């Protein structure tokens, strides 16, 4: 079977606090490491989706409704469901990596980086499906 968990692939989180949220793989580790002896992936995802926007709304209201809250986390492959979609969101690998979990300040910085990049991509109007809440 081919390796399909690749960076840029959209996944659904199945377990934990962010279950039901969409995320994108930043880095995948198929063979595991010494501290995590199972296949896992570093993902960046959307915790709070942007709200619906209509043409009748003003600029300030649209700006307020277009905010996104993100998360950065390492997940076991068992807790991720891959989709057929992939998005091209160029997250800065120096800011968003596995070392951020050692220091809360670095984690905040990584979350901020993901938030900024997600909002940029959202404003272009591409990948609409990724920025909509999964109805279940």
UniProtKB/Swiss-Prot annotation:
PROSITE patterns named among the record's database cross-references: RIBOSOMAL_L27E
The keyword Flavoprotein is annotated on this UniProt entry: no
GO molecular function: structural constituent of ribosome
GO CC terms in record: cytoplasmic side of rough endoplasmic reticulum membrane; cytosolic large ribosomal subunit; large ribosomal subunit
Pfam families: KOW (PF00467), Ribosomal_L27e (PF01777)
UniProt key word Ribonucleoprotein: yes
Coiled-coil blocks: none
Localization: Cytoplasm, Cytosol; Cytoplasm; Rough endoplasmic reticulum
UniProt KW keywords: Acetylation, Cytoplasm, Endoplasmic reticulum, Ribonucleoprotein, Ribosomal protein
Domain KOW as annotated: residue spans: 5-40
Entry-linked SMART domains: KOW
Any one biological process term the GO annotation gives: translation
InterPro entries: KOW (IPR005824), Ribosomal_eL27 (IPR001141), Ribosomal_eL27_CS (IPR018262), Ribosomal_eL27_KOW (IPR041991), Ribosomal_eL27_sf (IPR038655), Translation_prot_SH3-like_sf (IPR008991)
SUPFAM superfamilies (alphabetical): Translation proteins SH3-like domain
UniProt modified residues of type N6-acetyllysine: 27, 93
Subunit structure: Component of the large ribosomal subunit. Interacts with RRP1B. Component of the large ribosomal subunit. Interacts with RRP1B. Interacts with DHX33.
PANTHER family: 60S RIBOSOMAL PROTEIN L27
Functional note: Component of the large ribosomal subunit. Required for proper rRNA processing and maturation of 28S and 5.8S rRNAs.
Family, per entry: Belongs to the eukaryotic ribosomal protein eL27 family.
Protein name: Large ribosomal subunit protein eL27
Species: Canis lupus familiaris (Dog)
